[in-house]
Amino acid sequence: DNGGDAPLGGPADYGSSAPLRGKKGSEYEGGVRVPFIAAWAKPDAKNKFQKKYPIAQNAVQLQQGTVMDLYPTILSVAHVKSPKHYALDGADLKKLLQGKEDKNHRDDFLMHFPHGEHRANYFTTYRKGDWKLIYYYNPETTGVPTWKLYNLKDDPYEASEVSAKYPEKTASMIELMKKRL
């Protein structure tokens, strides 16, 4: 979950997610990117669930998933339908867990934090492919620009903000973020 409490800090002082920038709950990759490890506790080729829902062994999946994908995945494994009129934000991870590419799986991610008394800043992040856009709701109080753009392929540590260098990409990401909101 991206770090526990720092040993000398208060209850909301989380440890480092180094080498990524940010910490738990922040707008940066260190606040949201977490490795997910999945395996059957005891691989058994005869087990009916494992036959129907195999998990690739010793594989690394590069397509992203979110915690919202776990509920639909568990429903699928258990062969249970979601309750009627219950909106699902996530998607079944079956193909990804098999080590396959899922062309239908979303390649974007939205994290929306425009509220909360515990926050020092309010933001929305939108990630699509290698690009990530951050919107700050109160830039005048935090001293940061309203928009920040990062190319995570070239700069996974979010050290170089590139919105001025890529104004067209910034504009297109803003429109995509608005559509998701």
Walk through the language-model features, giving the residues of each:
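Short glycine- and hydrophobic/aromatic-rich loop-to-beta-strand nucleating segment
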Residues: F36-A38
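Active-site metal-binding loops of divalent metal-dependent hydrolases
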Residues: N2-G3
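Intrinsically disordered, low-complexity polar regions and short flexible loop motifs
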Residues: D155
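C-terminal cap/loop subdomain of S1 sulfatases and analogous C-terminal strand-loop tails that border
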Residues: A6-E29, K46-K48, Y53-A59, Q63, ...
